[in-house]
Amino acid sequence: MSIKVRLIIMNFLQFFVWGSWLISLGGYMGRELHFEGGQIGAIFATMGIASLVMPGIIGIIADKWFNAERLYGLCHIVGAACLFYASTATGYDQMYWAMLLNLLVYMPTLSLANTVSYNALEQYKCDLIKDFPPIRVWGTIGFICAMWAVDLTGFKNSSAQLYVGAISALLLGVYSFTLPACKPAKTENKSLLSAFGLDALVLFKRKKMAIFFLFSMLLGAALQITNTYGDLFLGSFAGIPEFADSFGVKHSVILLSISQMSETLFILAIPFFLKHFGIKQVMLISMFAWVFRFGLFGFGDPGGGLWMLILSMIVYGMAFDFFNISGSLFVEQETNSSIRASAQGLFFMITNGL
């Protein structure tokens, strides 16, 4: 099996795990467990807490002491146990702590997946800019497949969605141990920053990187809103008679999955845009795309305004990919191998935590 196929499997499962619950869990907690809006928001805020702390710490461990692919696998195995426990939760406190523990080990895997992929592609003399986006697009396909699976089976309204996530996380955790070794960097004459694993913080000394991380924080805030409340927002139209039986209400998760379908197209366009416009222009395009995303989503409805909702989903693909994937590639190019995992962890901490 070629290295590209092996990485495709990894990326597919990585986002299948997330897609099995990320979009639909809020609706399940609101409609079936009767959690209040503030409680749902607090549970999803654990994603920010986990992103603020863990990616950097796990990245440091991968850079200094532990093979990244093994650490990646362990995180998913622990995450599988947490999701299984979350599936049994019926109260707010249970669900909060279960999802916090799950996200503490899941969020670091987003950056570790990139580190493992980049390392494997470099080992096999592949071109990152050319070869990584077509591999990463399978992560989005995995996310879409998970969303459709939980919607069409009716799992979006039950704890079964968490069982799906737990099983797929366990499979990925075991599979990860078969991937090419991504060993810690062995450096001599370590500085004080290196000794404490804080190497990536030196990137803030460079004006270009400091500005990049600032905008990453702002765009990262926009990323979380529809993930948390999108399904609940569309489900709220069920209270309006003319929209109650509409496709957008009955199959809200499938409607939201158009966003991820759009991602698959824009991921493939990233090499072209980076080559012809550069990272600054690509990130600027992303900023404008986010404005249109929320404007269309806010004014649309499942009836005559369905076209605005659909267009909003399509624009999301550009907004997300041009920010998230291009940003990760930019960090990879601007850092050396000794701090690469730490730098990727820092990037995800800023975009998903702050």
State each model region's role:
Residues 1, 179-214, 239-244:
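Juxtamembrane intracellular "pre-TM" segments in multi-pass secondary transporters
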Residues 1-48, 208-243, 251-255, 324:
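Helix-loop boundary and gating motifs at the non-cytosolic
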Residues 42-60, 254-269:
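Central cavity-lining transmembrane alpha-helices of secondary-active solute carriers
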Residues 63-76, 275-287:
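Cytoplasmic membrane-interface "Motif A"-like loop-to-helix N-cap segments
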